[in-house]
Each structure stands twice: as structure tokens, then as C-alpha cells.
Swiss-Prot record:
It comes from Jannaschia sp. (strain CCS1). One of its GO terms (cellular component) is cytosol. Residues 1-149 form the MGS-like domain. Its EC number is 2.1.2.3, 3.5.4.10. The IMP cyclohydrolase activity resides in the N-terminal region. One of its GO terms (molecular function) is phosphoribosylaminoimidazolecarboxamide formyltransferase activity. Belongs to the PurH family. Keywords: Hydrolase, Multifunctional enzyme, Purine biosynthesis, Transferase. Signal peptide: none annotated. The gene is purH. The lineage of its organism: Bacteria, Pseudomonadati, Pseudomonadota, Alphaproteobacteria, Rhodobacterales. Pathway: Purine metabolism; IMP biosynthesis via de novo pathway; 5-formamido-1-(5-phospho-D-ribosyl)imidazole-4-carboxamide from 5-amino-1-(5-phospho-D-ribosyl)imidazole-4-carboxamide (10-formyl THF route): step 1/1; Purine metabolism; IMP biosynthesis via de novo pathway; IMP from 5-formamido-1-(5-phospho-D-ribosyl)imidazole-4-carboxamide: step 1/1. PANTHER family: BIFUNCTIONAL PURINE BIOSYNTHESIS PROTEIN ATIC, BIFUNCTIONAL PURINE BIOSYNTHESIS PROTEIN PURH. Pfam families: AICARFT_IMPCHas, MGS. This is Bifunctional purine biosynthesis protein PurH.
Length: 532
């Protein structure tokens, strides 16, 4: 293996022509022979560059609407031949195959085509065949061949050639190896995207093989803890959220910021903007307070009041455009991230004085009922499930107690149930007047979560100068059934008047009897919302 490897002949075939002309011009000025196909060759010629068509090299025209262009021994032999293997060199000479030292290919825009909602046939035609085949061939032979799969790599190659100018030019093995790894990563991601799309098109819920396709968006200082390395990858989805948001100010998002911001925005997106303002404050992926209001500022204050201590250093998510009044409330304490569909200029000006506050806008809210896939890694495998998009319409709620909830209780029950869906199990949510007043999350027993939620409600009453705990007259949501009556009785003792839970316990009759004895209204959803 010669190092650096010479670069005298390049094949360029790209869909994305960003930077192509400048790059190819530089290569040509270094004496590199240019081979190309179709539209790429046309663009190069129009720029005044001398380029040789691949069809001239292969002796075959491009055919079948461009489906067959480069799938030929004259091309793949030039990419795969080992330069220091006498038999390979002899075969090249015998068949007139010229070595190809540089391959520059970016693939048909399959992912973008799917994201744009194209029909089935259009998506099929945007599955690249010749490109991945050449990329894999060049990457396999990176002992001699350099492969580029993205325009962002052009400058790096030219710098590499400059660095090796005193050695006759060419590329080092280390550079070619890095480019080969990137190339295999690109083809793997491309094939994963095709496979995932086809599984969806064929309605295959559990394909025999599954791969995640992602592109590196950010290398982070560290992960969940400082001793952990971390990075953020994008899957190409256009779903509004932290991955697609525009950051207006503040330093780069951390691993924990991204995780918590995603949790916050997914929760607040359950509340349609047309139904009124809503705000969620998140800490460690759990809500510390959630509220609706007549204005965003009012909703924020109600969410903040639920747990003023935990809100410090939290994530704030809004379901409507951030305005100045709400911004003024938010900057009263330290907040890590604010995410909203949009922000007006007055709000941005207020935030500008808080350099460490990160502001993200998404351009809209995600559809909380849109199907998605959720992944969880375990040792030796990957758990895959549908994202929890479950919801219960009011007419499907089953009243199981003697007393039915009032209209206000029912509205609060539905609100609390939505918050419980986004709270780590075991989850107990106290709510009143469209706002949480006590949240118990992540406890190993449901009665402990109920007790903690009641204690937090009592603390809220003290901090807000209330005459009594806001748990009095509140409603309670439980993400799973009460296995015993103790958790429900704890809620009743705290002053709750109505309960929403899935039902389904062997002791439902005992729990219902306890609710009736306490004068509670209780409804069953028939749906559980465990969250781990």
C-alpha cells in the first residue's frame, strides 16, 4: 500500500451539487482526470471543465431511465482492484480497466422524498442502487481509494492534498479510513431508511431486522453525567420538536437539556392552541407543574406555583407563541430552556438579557396522536414499541361510582389524566381549575406517590399563602389502577373529590366501595399509561 495514495482519476456522480463546481475545478487544476454521469457531467461541462462520460468508459449508454449507469466491471474494477496485487494489475491491463482513485457520490434524496410525502412509485424511483454499490466498493478498497459522500467533506480532501503536496500529493491512509467509515455509515443509514419506510408501506409491525438511521447533529461535552461521552443524532423526521427547532440564543444544548426539552414539548403539545394557552415545566423528564390559563402568563404562573422549588433550573414549554408578558414571568428565576412554536420580538428582547437562557422555536406543535416508534436499549438488545399516543374521549369514560363527576371535575380529570401520561410511574396527579397542584412521580408504590403529591400540594398552599391546601376540592389521576384502596383513601384524606384511573384491578370492587364511602366520583379509562 502506497501512502499517501496518489489521486489522478476521479469519478463524480452527485444528486446534491452544492460546492461541486468549485471542488471539481480545484481537482482539475491539480491534473486530476474527471469522470462523471448524467446531470453531474452536464453541470461540469457547463462550467467549462473537461469531463469524460462514464458511458464512454464502459462502452454502454445510460439506460432504463438512468437505472443502469455505473454497474459495470470497467467502473467497479477500477474501484476494487488492489494496486499492489499483480493478478489484479494484470487483469486491469488485459481488460483496459483504469484505476479510479477518488469516488465522489451522494445518493438520491430518498429520505427527503419520503419526508415530502411523495407517493409510493416516486419513493421507489428515489432508491439509489448504483451509488451505494460504488460507495461500498470504494470504501472496501480504502487502502488505495478515497471516497466522499457529502459536500461537507470537499474542503477536508483539498486540505489533505495540500498537506501532502511535498510527498507528491494524494491522501493518507488515516484520511481514507475516516472517509470509508463515514461512507459505510451513510449507506447503512440509507438502507435503514429504505427498510423502515418499506416496513411502514407494507404494514409490517415487527420486521425481522431493524436499524436506526441517523446523522450526527452535535457532539456534546458529556452525557447524562460528566464521565459519559455523548452525541445527538437526527433521524430525518420533520416532526416539530427539539430536534428540528431553531435556537435563538444561549449555549449548546446538553444531553439532559435535549431529553428534558423533548419531554416538556411532547407534554404541552397535548393541549391544542385553539383550546387555550398551556404551559409545562419539566425537571428530570417529569413535570413539576402544568397549567392552562386565559393567557400564557397566567398559565405559566399557575404551573410555577405548583412546585416553585423544582421549577428552578427547569425546562418551560408553551403551546402558543411566547409573548413579552410571559417572558417577563419566566426570567424571574433561572430557567435552562424555553421551547415554543414561536416567539415575538418583544419576548426575544427580554430573553436577550439572559445569556444562559436557551430559546427554541419549532414553527408548530407535533400531532400527539401521530404514530411513532419508541426504542429502549437493554443489554444485548433493543425494545421497540409504538409510542404511547393513547387518549380517551369523554364519552368512553366509565363512571363506576354512585356519584358522577361534575362538568368542572370532568374537565380537571381529563387534564390530570393527560399530565399523568407524561409522568414517570407510579404517577399521581392532583389538579384543580386546569392546573396541577401536586405531583407524585416515580415511586415504587402508588400510595407513596399519592402521599408525596398530597405533601407537595400542602407545600404549594403554604408557599402561595393559601388558607388551606389546594388539594381540597381537587381531582386525582393515577396512571395505573389502584391495587388497593389505600392510595385512593390518601387522596380522599387530602381533600380530593374525584378520581380517574384505568381500572382493571382484581380489587376494583373494593376500591369502588371505598370511593363511594368517601363520597368520591370515580371514572375508569380502560387504558393504562405506565412510563418508565
Amino acid at each position: 500500500m502506497t501512502d499517501p495514495a496518489p489521486l489522478t482519476r476521479a469519478l463524480l456522480s452527485v444528486s446534491d451539487k452544492t460546492g461541486l463546481i468549485e471542488f471539481a475545478t480545484d481537482l482539475s487544476s491539480r491534473g486530476v482526470e474527471l469522470l462523471s454521469t448524467g446531470g453531474t457531467a452536464k453541470a461540469l461541462r457547463e462550467a467549462g471543465l473537461d469531463v469524460r462520460d462514464v458511458s464512454e468508459v464502459t462502452g454502454f449508454p445510460e439506460m432504463m431511465d438512468g437505472r443502469v449507469k455505473t454497474l459495470h466491471p470497467m467502473i467497479h474494477g477500477g474501484l476494487l482492484a488492489l494496486r499492489d496485487n499483480d493478478a489484479h494489475v494484470a487483469a486491469m491491463k488485459e481488460h483496459g480497466i483504469g484505476a479510479i482513485d477518488l469516488l465522489v457520490v451522494n445518493l438520491y434524496p430518498f429520505e427527503a422524498t419520503v419526508a415530502a410525502g411523495a407517493d409510493y412509485d416516486t419513493c421507489i424511483e428515489n432508491i439509489d442502487i448504483g451509488g451505494p454499490a460504488m460507495i461500498r466498493a470504494a470504501a472496501k478498497n480504502h487502502g488505495a481509494v478515497t471516497v466522499l459522500t457529502d459536500s461537507s467533506q470537499y474542503a477536508g480532501l483539498l486540505s489533505e492534498l495540500d498537506a501532502n503536496a511535498n510527498k507528491g500529493g494524494g491522501t493518507s491512509f488515516q484520511f481514507r479510513q475516516r472517509m470509508a467509515q463515514a461512507a459505510y455509515g451513510r449507506t447503512a443509514a440509507y438502507d435503514a431508511a429504505v427498510s423502515s419506510w418499506m416496513a411502514g408501506a407494507a404494514e409490517i409491525k415487527t420486521p425481522p431486522h431493524r436499524a436506526f438511521a441517523g446523522s450526527l447533529a452535535q457532539e456534546m461535552r458529556y452525557g447524562e453525567n460528566p464521565h459519559q461521552k455523548a452525541a445527538f443524532y437526527l433521524d430525518g423526521s420533520s416532526r416539530p420538536g427539539v430536534a428540528t427547532a431553531q435556537q435563538h440564543q444561549g449555549k449548546a444544548l446538553s444531553y439532559n437539556n435535549i431529553n428534558d426539552t423533548d419531554a416538556a414539548f411532547e407534554l404541552v403539545s397535548e393541549f391544542a392552541p385553539d383550546d387555550g394557552p398551556a404551559v409545562a415545566i419539566i425537571k428530570h423528564a417529569n413535570p413539576s407543574g402544568v397549567a392552562r390559563g386565559n393567557s400564557l402568563a397566567e398559565a405559566y404562573k399557575a404551573a410555577f406555583d405548583c412546585d416553585r422549588t423544582s421549577a428552578f433550573g427547569g425546562i418551560v414549554a408553551l403551546n402558543q407563541t411566547l409573548d413579552a408578558a410571559t417572558a417577563e414571568e419566566i426570567v424571574q428565576i433561572f430557567t435552562e430552556v424555553v421551547i415554543a412554536p414561536d416567539a415575538d420580538e418583544d419576548a426575544k428582547a427580554i430573553f436577550a438579557a439572559k445569556k444562559n437562557l436557551r430559546l427554541l422555536t419549532t414553527g408548530g406543535l407535533p400531532d400527539p396522536r401521530a404514530p411513532m416508534v419508541a426504542y429502549k436499549q437493554v443489554a444485548g438488545g433493543l425494545l421497540v414499541q409504538d409510542k404511547d399516543t393513547g387518549h380517551v374521549d369523554p364519552e368512553l369514560l366509565e363512571v363506576v361510582t354512585k356519584r358522577a363527576p361534575s362538568a368542572q371535575e370532568l374537565a380537571d380529570l381529563r387534564f390530570a389524566w393527560t399530565v399523568a401520561k407524561h409522568t414517570k410511574s407510579n404517577a399521581i396527579i392532583y389538579a384543580k381549575g386546569g392546573a396541577t397542584v401536586g405531583i407524585g412521580a416515580g415511586q415504587m408504590s402508588r400510595v407513596d406517590s399519592s402521599t408525596i403529591a398530597a405533601l407537595k400540594a400542602a407545600r404549594m398552599g403554604t408557599e402561595c399563602g393559601m388558607a388551606d391546601t389546594p388539594a381540597k376540592g381537587s381531582v386525582v389521576a393515577s396512571d395505573a389502577f389502584f391495587p388497593f384502596a389505600d392510595g385512593l383513601l390518601a387522596a380522599a384524606e387530602a381533600g380530593a373529590t374525584a378520581v380517574i384511573q384505568p381500572g382493571g384491578s382484581m380489587r376494583d370492587a373494593d376500591v369502588i366501595a371505598a370511593a363511594d364511602e368517601a363520597g368520591l366520583a370515580m371514572v375508569f379509562t380502560g387504558m393504562r399509561h405506565f412510563r418508565h
